[in-house]
From Swiss-Prot:
It holds the Pfam family Peptidase_M1_N. Homodimer. Interacts with SLC6A19. The active site is at residue 385. Keywords: Aminopeptidase, Angiogenesis, Cell membrane, Developmental protein, Differentiation, Disulfide bond, Glycoprotein, Hydrolase, Membrane, Metal-binding, Metalloprotease, Phosphoprotein, Protease, Signal-anchor, Sulfation, Transmembrane, Transmembrane helix, Zinc. This is Aminopeptidase N. It comes from the Eukaryota. It comes from Oryctolagus cuniculus (Rabbit). Its cofactor is Zn(2+).
């Protein structure tokens, strides 16, 4: 599943200093505003009410000896196949509810004798047949015991069938059910999405099963290791199209009502429940055939398809599929690849096997109004989801504790697949900014977590949802990139192909991948490792955090320590490796590559590679940032690197120019170098025109903005940034012929946005005039937008910030009338840039009205308001006052709470704010925090670190900005 961003996912080019930095995470991890009713849906006369004695007490009071009180399924029964018939009703019933009805037959094998059948079921009402919710029969002569009773256990989401006798080990059985569920607009399970076609409201029935919502669609053994085959048969209105994982086998009229069509799909391969998908809609498609005869189709609203918005996704899908087939040395496993853009969708995208679902913004692209970043998002998200068709779908992790392997791998190779489709963009470099740098801010906390956790620590749906975080996606991608780098890509691919061939249609744990990579290493002699793949990688997978590698060039000593943002924080999570890593250290001396060195799990060692003599000689470590660690140096080497940057920066690779800035600011935050040293590393930017160093600087300085934009430091800081960015602003003004054309390269187009956003937000009058004039031209002629799509996010935001009610109302009207989601998203984020308190308060109220802001966008909009220094207090008051309602409406397992807590607390840096946050935690212990539990602990830790950092650095920072802004 695409993070959507997490999100996002994630370009980091939308003007961090404008106060919308929260969007970088949100795009990746955009989340659902749930309104699923806590009570059960109204029941038809034939439906049994939910068991009035269904378990609902806290898990701690339950008898854990009873298997239906445990969240994990017993291993007594293994599913073989399902036959599922579903009929969604796309207009409300007499109670005003949208519903679906269904029937299911599951065939399963008894592995161990048992007198109980436990199968997942969530918010389904069952037809009583022969006195029970299920009918059980034997297969091939086996005789089932009689049913004693059935019950629904709400807390653990089970349908439990108690038997009068034992099921026999080795025998097969079939169980039939008939049921009804609500086709709710909660973005989970089998749900309803809506859109307008002219003045007509259209309804789509669609699915989102990951991680634990297939059970909301039909009763199933809803764990990833419980693979089976599926026969899916939707019954749908005649004029609608049904889609599923496979191609249709037949489509016939429903005998009793020809206005309905029965579409039966071919049997799926053996697969996990979370990868199922079925959709009923009036969407249309465009189609192509890949060189390997795979049918490729892009589906969306008819108007989007007719206007060509699916063409770019269609163009890149074939090349990306071919790239991965070659990369994995494994053919694409299915006959077709459908991809569909949905108006309402929780995540960025979902890798359902053969039927990938997307937010419209992650699939559709209009060259007339979409920006280059929108285009990059499409190609990278498509690559991410298609990578999963092999790694995750064909071979699946055994349990969610190894989710990092699925999502980290896809988050790494998405850059490779996208780079193949767009070879001139240099997309592979962006993984450093988008993934590695961003996740280190989280992984440097004592409340971080390892990539892989013991399986018994991940049980509930909320615990599973909590794993869909930046550690899983971005750290996973970063350490796999490091592994591929020190193995070489060829060896990595060889081991990967062996892994996929061995475990096709099966489940694995991460150790299985290590074993096959080790076999590839053992088959050759050119690459020699200091230890086994497992011994090296377990230190990166099983312990949280990462090292700071310190190179002392005066004596050649190289050492490592667990990097913590707050070095005084208490690390309570033990490590079998004592927080020491086996670290691959690449380096250069004065621009010349040195041989690779391994820091072999020891705290320090000495080597002449790292000793430097002479006033002008320097060492640079972690070339192209292939290693997942930060680098510190002795003061003399830092000064020499700064001199090199200010005299001839091109000697240092552009990625490492970004690394020097990023690492120094992080080291300063952890009090390992003076904050003035980190600030000195930005002095060369006055002559820098490359995107990556500028983006690293703006991302790092955004922390200073968050800490100081309410204090006297902010004025000198703005003056310094204005001075540094002015040459960049003039550079892009010149090469774009006074902003009338766009730069040639992707990186330059991104840095043009940085130039304008930074210039405007730091008071350069020419920039403010530019954006105000462009916005006024649009207001004067709303049907003719003169603002280039690349520049719209930053122009909209700055014009609204500089303007008042008139500008805001105009943008709101344009948002309400926007027909393309990319344009709507730009306007939605920009509306949070207002400097008027009452306008922001009004906008905040709109987020709870789904007629104004779609539920999928509510949380990200709240976060955008919180990222505005004026809106942050409004949102924090709102969250404190409404936490219980938000928790009930959004759902305890939603991804939204982690993002919401991070966004609203990111400026906290005073004792008063810490006390407020601690009181908030105490006040809501009974309600709970769901998937935001870890984020709350991280927010408390981050706030304490912020308080300490501000106290220790404020005076020095004020003095530095004052001295360097002249």
């Amino acid at each position: 599943m695409a993070k959507g961003f997490y999100i996002s996912k994630s370009l980091g080019i939308l003007g961090i200093l404008l106060g919308v930095a929260a969007l970088c995470t949100i795009v990746a991890l955009s989340v659902v505003y749930r309104q699923e009713k806590n009570k059960n849906t109204s029941q038809s006369p034939s439906m049994a009410p939910l068991n009035p004695t269904a378990t609902s007490s806290p898990a701690t009071t339950l008898d854990q000896n009873l298997p239906w009180n445990r969240y994990r399924l017993p291993k007594t029964l293994i599913p073989d196949s399902y036959n599922v018939v579903l009929r969604p009703y796309l207009s409300p019933n007499s109670q005003g509810l949208y519903i679906f009805t269904g029937s299911s037959t599951v065939r399963f094998t008894c592995q161990e004798a048992t007198n109980v059948i436990i199968i997942h079921s969530k918010k389904l009402n069952y037809t009583i047949t022969q006195g029970h919710r299920v009918v059980l029969r034997g297969v091939r002569g086996s005789q089932p015991p009689a049913i004693a009773s059935t019950e629904l256990v709400e807390l653990t989401e089970y349908l439990v069938v108690h038997l009068q006798g034992q099921l026999v080990a080795g025998s097969q059985y079939e169980m039939d059910t008939q049921f009804q569920g609500e086709l709710a607009d909660d973005l989970a399970g089998f749900y309803r999405s809506e859109y307008m076609e002219g003045n007509v409201r259209k309804v789509v029935a669609t699915t989102q099963m990951q991680a634990a919502d297939a059970r909301k669609s039909f009763p199933c053994f809803d764990e990833p290791a419980m693979k089976a085959t599926f026969n899916i048969t939707p019954i749908h209105p005649r004029d609608y199209t049904a889609l599923s994982n496979m191609l249709p086998r037949s489509s016939t009229a429903l005998p009793e009502d020809p206005n309905w069509t029965v579409t039966e799909f071919h049997t799926t391969p053996k697969m996990s429940t979370y990868l199922l998908a079925y959709i009923v809609s009036e969407f249309t498609n465009i189609e192509a055939q890949s060189p390997n005869n795979v049918q490729i189709r892009i589906w969306a609203r008819p108007s989007a398809i007719s206007e060509g918005h699916g063409q770019y996704a269609l163009n890149v899908t074939g090349p990306i599929l071919n790239f991965f087939a070659n990369h994995y040395n494994t053919p694409y496993p299915l006959e077709k690849s459908d991809q569909i853009g949905l108006p309402d969708f929780n995540a960025g995208a979902m890798e359902n096997w053969g039927l990938v679902t997307y937010r419209e913004s992650a699939l559709l692209f209009d060259p007339l109004v979409s920006s280059i970043s929108n285009k990059e998002r499409v190609v990278t998200v498509v690559a991410h989801e298609l990578a999963h068709q092999w790694f995750g779908n064909l071979v699946t992790v055994d349990w969610w504790n190894d989710l990092w392997l699925n999502e980290g791998f896809a988050s790494y190779v998405e850059y490779l697949g996208a780079d193949y489709a767009e070879p001139t963009w240099n997309l592979k470099d962006l993984i450093v900014l988008n993934e590695l740098h961003s996740v280190m801010a989280v992984d440097a906390l004592a409340s971080s977590h390892p990539l892989s956790s013991p399986a018994d620590e991940v049980n509930t749906p909320a615990q599973i949802s909590e794993l869909f975080d930046s550690i899983t996606y971005s750290k996973g991608a970063s350490v796999l990139r490091m592994l591929s780098s020190f193995l070489t890509e060829d060896l990595f691919k060889e081991g990967l192909a062996s892994y996929l061939h061995t475990f096709a249609y099966q489940n694995t744990i991460y150790l299985d991948l290590w074993e096959h990579l080790q076999q590839a290493v053992n088959s050759q002699s050119a690459i020699q490792l200091p230890a086994s793949v497992r011994d090296i990688m377990d230190r990166w997978i099983l312990q949280m955090g990462f090292p700071v590698v310190t190179v002392n060039t005066t004596n050649g000593i190289i050492s490592q320590h667990h990097f913590l943002l707050d070095p005084t924080s208490n690390v309570t999570r033990p490590s079998d490796f004592n927080y020491l890593w086996i670290v691959p250290v690449s380096s250069m001396r004065n621009g010349v590559l040195e041989q690779e060195f391994w820091l072999e799990g020891v705290e320090q060692t000495q080597n002449s590679l790292f000793r430097v003599e002479g006033d002008n000689n320097w060492i640079l470590a972690n070339l192209n940032v292939t290693g997942y660690y930060q680098v510190n140096y002795d003061e003399g080497n830092w000064k020499k690197l700064q001199t090199q940057l200010q005299t001839n920066p091109s000697v240092i690779p552009v990625i490492n120019r970004a690394q020097i800035i990023h690492d120094a600011f992080n080291l300063a935050s952890a009090q390992k170098v003076p904050v003035t040293l980190a600030l000195d590393n930005t002095l060369f930017l006055i002559r820098e025109t490359e995107y990556m160093p500028w983006q690293a600087a703006l991302s790092s300085l955004n922390y200073f903005k968050l800490m100081f934009d309410r204090s006297e430091v902010y004025g000198p800081m703005k003056n310094y940034l204005s001075k540094q960015v002015r040459p960049l602003f003039e550079h892009f003004k010149n090469i774009t012929n006074d902003w009338t054309r766009r730069p040639d390269t992707l990186m330059d187009q991104y840095n043009e946005i940085n130039a304008i956003s930074t210039a405007c937000s730091n008071g350069i009058q020419e920039c403010e005039t530019l954006v105000s004039d462009l916005f006024k031209q649009w207001m004067d002629d709303p049907s003719n937008n003169p603002i280039h799509p690349n520049l719209r996010t930053t122009v909209y935001c700055n014009a609204i910030a500089l303007g008042g009610e008139r500008e805001w109302d105009f943008a709101w009207e344009q948002f309400r009338n926007a027909t393309l989601v990319n344009e709507a998203d730009k306007l939605r984020s920009a509306l949070a840039c207002s400097n008027e308190v009452w306008i922001l308060n009004r906008y905040l109220s709109y987020t709870l009205n789904p007629d104004y802001i779609r539920r999928q966008d509510a949380t990200s909009t709240i976060n955008s308001i919180a990222s505005n220094v004026i809106g942050q207090t409004l949102v924090w008051d709102f969250v404190q006052s409404n936490w219980k309602k938000l928790f009930e409406d959004f759902g305890g397992g939603s991804f939204s709470f982690a993002n919401l807590i991070r966004a609203v607390t990111r400026r906290f840096s005073t004792e008063y704010e810490l006390q407020q946050l601690e009181q908030f935690r105490l006040n809501n212990l009974d309600t709970g925090f769901g998937s935001g539990t870890r984020a709350l602990e991280q927010a408390l830790e981050q706030t304490r670190a912020n308080i300490k950092w501000v106290q220790e650095n404020k005076e020095a920072v004020l003095a530095w900005f004052t001295a360097n802004s002249a």
